[in-house]
């Protein structure tokens, strides 16, 4: 009945023309498809709060052709590429996706599959850890193990998706499409500009509102522009959370050593410089070292705020505790109803509301669900948005 159930792993921070191209390419590749997006919620993989909240992002995604939006919980969305990818692929697997389509700079799937297979060997893993221990970033370390094979940021994520598919023995079939013109950090000013460039415009404190909106108008679809315009003035960035981060570091200094991804000794720098700096930028630059990338430090700061520990990461690393549906279209609803008839439906842990949690989740899974809800509540402290509830339903 549903042959082409296609998964996307996205952040939509914010949704731009390149994302629309991704969706259109899926429609070109697969007729009569169901598109399921695993989407970072209120926090993204670079270790930052999402520019706009997850419910607004869900509205945009549904308006542009996505059929089901699944939240990628914070304990996956703010992690390294490996954990981010594995959690995402596991979620798509829970909803029986037949395919996954991702962007790639190289657009060479055979090459990426070969590298993914090699990268799962013990020899590769040992070499990778050696380079990481020397202070190289994950993408650079990965490249060095491959004798300086040049890989773009999207190629690295693509490799992690392929590795995850192999690791969990998923039947999902991978497709890649050419990443249109821009890389993760590109400042290209054509109609396929990157999310990084668009955020840079919107968060520029030296520009007037009208100028910012004019600059992005041709870079995002019309409905995305409308939502961004409505949310103008309440865009979230990490510096907004500095007082909360600082409070938590000072209050829980002795517990910081248990925080996910924290290097030994870094807890002392966090404590020392949080006491000495009133401004986030000064604090951040003092803590930053050559051994830590900007994104990694941002992730560590969020983990300290949430108290996201190594113990929590170990619990969710190999098995997703729940599947939270943020929204769906009429077609998406039909697919969800179809899944309800499957024999293993209860094992999928699908949540379409906060009701009946005790009937669906066990005690440990419920704790992890509540942890993710707490992270969103912290986001709402600074973003001034009201939780209107989920799922968001788009009638076709």
From Swiss-Prot:
InterPro entries (UniProt xref): Rossmann-like_a/b/a_fold (IPR014729), tRNA(Met)_cyd_acetate_ligase (IPR008513)
Pfam families: HIGH_NTase1
UniProt main location, coarse: cytoplasm
GO cellular component: cytoplasm
Known EC number: 6.3.4.-
Highest taxon above the source species: Bacteria
Molecular function terms from GO: ATP binding; ligase activity, forming carbon-nitrogen bonds; tRNA binding
Enzyme's top EC category: ligase
Swiss-Prot/TrEMBL keywords: ATP-binding, Cytoplasm, Ligase, Nucleotide-binding, RNA-binding, tRNA processing, tRNA-binding
HAMAP family (alphabetical): TmcAL
Family: Belongs to the TmcAL family.
PANTHER family (UniProt xref): TRNA(MET) CYTIDINE ACETATE LIGASE
Function: Catalyzes the formation of N(4)-acetylcytidine (ac(4)C) at the wobble position of elongator tRNA(Met), using acetate and ATP as substrates. First activates an acetate ion to form acetyladenylate (Ac-AMP) and then transfers the acetyl group to tRNA to form ac(4)C34.
Name this protein carries in UniProt: tRNA(Met) cytidine acetate ligase
The gene coding this protein: tmcAL
């Amino acid at each position: 009945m549903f042959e082409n159930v296609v998964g996307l792993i996205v952040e939509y921070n914010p949704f731009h023309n390149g994302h629309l191209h991704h969706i259109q390419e899926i429609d070109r590749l697969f007729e009569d498809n169901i598109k399921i997006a695993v989407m970072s919620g209120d926090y993204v993989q670079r270790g930052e709060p999402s520019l706009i909240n997850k419910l607004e992002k869900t509205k945009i995604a549904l308006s542009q052709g996505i059929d089901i939006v699944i939240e990628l919980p914070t304990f996956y969305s703010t992690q390294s590429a490996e954990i981010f990818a594995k959690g995402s692929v596991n979620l798509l697997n829970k909803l029986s996706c037949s395919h996954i389509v991702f962007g790639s700079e190289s657009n060479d799937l055979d090459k990426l599959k070969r590298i993914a297979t090699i990268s799962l060997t013990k020899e590769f893993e040992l070499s990778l850890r050696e380079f990481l221990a020397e202070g190289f970033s994950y993408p650079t370390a990965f490249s060095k193990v491959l004798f300086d094979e040049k890989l773009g940021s999207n190629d690295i994520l693509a490799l992690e998706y392929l590795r995850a598919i192999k690791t969990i023995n998923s039947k999902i079939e991978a497709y890649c499409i050419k990443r249109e013109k821009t890389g993760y950090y590109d400042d290209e000013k054509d109609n396929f500009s990157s999310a990084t460039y668009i955020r840079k415009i919107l968060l520029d404190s030296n520009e007037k509102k009208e100028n910012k909106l004019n600059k992005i108008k041709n870079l995002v679809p019309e409905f995305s522009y409308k939502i961004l315009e409505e949310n103008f003035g309440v865009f979230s960035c990490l510096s907004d959370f500095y007082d909360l981060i600082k409070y938590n570091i000072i209050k829980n200094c002795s517990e910081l050593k248990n925080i996910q991804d924290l290097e030994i000794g870094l807890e002392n720098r966090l404590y020392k410089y949080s006491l000495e700096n009133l401004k986030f930028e000064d604090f951040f630059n003092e803590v930053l070292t050559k051994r830590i990338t900007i994104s990694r430090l941002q992730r560590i700061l969020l983990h300290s705020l949430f108290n996201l520990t190594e113990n929590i990461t170990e619990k969710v690393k190999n098995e997703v505790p729940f599947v939270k549906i943020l929204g769906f279209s009429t077609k998406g609803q039909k697919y969800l109803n179809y899944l309800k008839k499957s024999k293993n439906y209860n094992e999928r842990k699908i949540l379409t509301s906060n009701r009946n949690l005790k009937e669906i989740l066990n005690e440990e899974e419920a704790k992890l669900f509540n942890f993710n809800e707490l992270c969103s509540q912290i986001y709402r402290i600074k973003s001034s948005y009201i939780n209107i509830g989920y799922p968001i339903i788009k009638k076709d």
